[in-house]
């Protein structure tokens, strides 16, 4: 089928008509118009074509309208004529390239399908002239009005994309073909390997079956020899008969699993179907068919068949049982025979329960053997549990309990026994005993010997000591070029600060100690951990009590002293007075003929600081300070606190060895793994050598200031030492409380006699040293009547648990340089618990002293008024006995306290109820006058008794 288009306008020649020139764009055709009654008429129709085009497609010229579409069969005949006209028609009829100027010379039919417009061809079929005339052929001479059938850019792009996609698909198909070939080769290799494995397994199975058949044949021969001869003859006669009903030569309905039957099995006599079937199950390792199994209802039928054979005169065949074949290790675990299990390479493996039972059986057999007793050296502490003793002896705790039961003691593995009982048990079981004390766990941690060849010089540790406000911290600030005083509350140091400075390329470690009287323990710790002590004395204040105390601490620690006479810039400074005052305390400076170095400095104006540092280096050079940096670290805890963000933080001074992150150390009763090391400038360091102060993070708890620490080998050792020290601390606390209170009877008597009152407190501070100083200061405030009772103290902020404890013990909460969190504040407000914050120890001690003074009972003071002698005693109705007296000394006041003295013995003390002169009540009666007196609730008065009158005053006391 060809479409008629006007792409090429040519002249057409009709042999029946004259030669005419067709108008461009107009096509004439003749059609037959039908009328009624079969009449027709030829009508000339002119078709004028219009060309419509859109921006995204090429303009096309519509074909002439036709009354009916052309037949499909006419397309192949008209194709040669219309091939040059339409590219789409040419592509539809043959896979030849269209005569267009396109980059691709060839294109398959599928990619060019979107270019053709079949709906145009269907709507505009080729016009057929009447009488079988063909359409006019194009005239190449006339080109007027012609429209070239060129491809638009979008169609060219579509064809180009189709070609590229076809090429991509071709590459992908080629790659898939290569992969498929590779996979097919691997599959063939795998199948060949499987066939080889199957053949090998089949050969092994055949060999095994042959061996089993041979063993079975030998067993049958032995059984046949043991059977009597008549039965054998009857059996041979019976072999001629066919097999009984229900016996099948082979299992037709059961799969054989691909196992070949053993060929060439030796037979006795003629072939016997029944024995073959009976032997098939043991050979193949699977149960017999249901038809061959003896069921409960089949025994009578078998007996009937045997009786029928006997009646017919034929000897009954005796039942021959197959010999029992002992299964091997593989057959025991084979189980049911199936196709899956038969085709698999390996049989069923032993289960975990079977393996466990086998191991337990082996262990029991080993335990039944008599083993040689091993004698061990058992280390026994002061107390030990039965379980721990059994582990150390490598014995069962059950055996120890049985032994104790024989001795009449019922005990459990967790019970604790003493060292003597443990020694008896160990010796009874044949072990030797080594008795140790609990304190032995600490042996060796501080006794590590230094390697003399590895000793190197270390920086000196210098402690700055002196009286409060003599300028210790200011001097250290001037040396460090920092300002620490402004950070201390009240301008006084309440912590131990450790720093390092560099002078002439050499490091010096400084420890600043508080000078307040409450911080005696801190100064003592600072003196013990130092090499050199700098005694700071103000030139305008001379020697003070804490100065003397610092001198005593330094002498007790055996460290040399360097005197720094500070504040020489003041007008009232008198350094010579300081030197003279030091002579009274056996401190002889060089200017006075001694060996103690003294330097006049001014921390405020930074005068002579270099001389002071040079004196320190000179003294350190004389001491020849050395340490081994390669050994495990040891040192002392200078300060400890509980930081909210970092946990327990301990400021330590390394004295020996080098400390690294990850080391396990014990500090007092606490232990932990070092998570980080922070120097005095807040920088994280990888290691801390000798004489270096650092902060340690990672301890399980907050140690006490002054505790020694040491690095141990493992966590078990550290935990053991820490538990021992905690237990020791608890025992000391109990002993201290029991010593202070005594027995219950003594405590009750003391309360009744003295009436000691307690002021409960919960103290929370920023560092452990401050808490220790506060506790010691409050202990000194106590008297026989009142004392401060520290319910709880610790480093860290105030929490809800502290408030709950204070509420239970009716205590007040004191926070020193710490604050309570919001939950604790809300809880304290609800429960009415008072929380007081302090940052200066002076104010804290003064307030606690005032509060404790309020608990003191007021002082009772008596003032003598006068004496009166009883002259006569009168009995008055409704009043009682009234004494008629004369005032002999002083005066007597109404409502005053009186004592009745008889024979110089006080027999009554009370109050005066009435005082009358004649019949009038009077306030007082002076000396020399007579009066009448009556006592409250007392009538035993006699003539001649003396009445002593006095006034009682209650005066409040203070501590």
Swiss-Prot record:
Residues 1-374 are annotated as: Disordered. Pfam families: EF-G_D2 (PF22042), GTP_EFTU (PF00009), GTP_EFTU_D2 (PF03144), IF-2 (PF11987), IF2_assoc (PF08364), IF2_N (PF04760). The keyword Amino-acid biosynthesis does not apply. It comes from the Bacteria. Its main location: cytoplasm. Residues 27-37 have a biased composition (Polar residues). GTP binds at residues 466-473, 512-516, 566-569. Residues 602-604 are annotated as: G5. Residues 1-10, 154-225, 232-241, 318-333 have a biased composition (Basic and acidic residues). The gene is infB. Residues 466-473 are annotated as: G1. The keyword Protein biosynthesis applies. It is found in: Cytoplasm. GO terms for molecular function: GTP binding; GTPase activity; guanosine tetraphosphate binding; translation initiation factor activity. Residues 63-118, 128-138, 246-284 have a biased composition (Low complexity). This is Translation initiation factor IF-2. Residues 457-626 form the tr-type G domain.
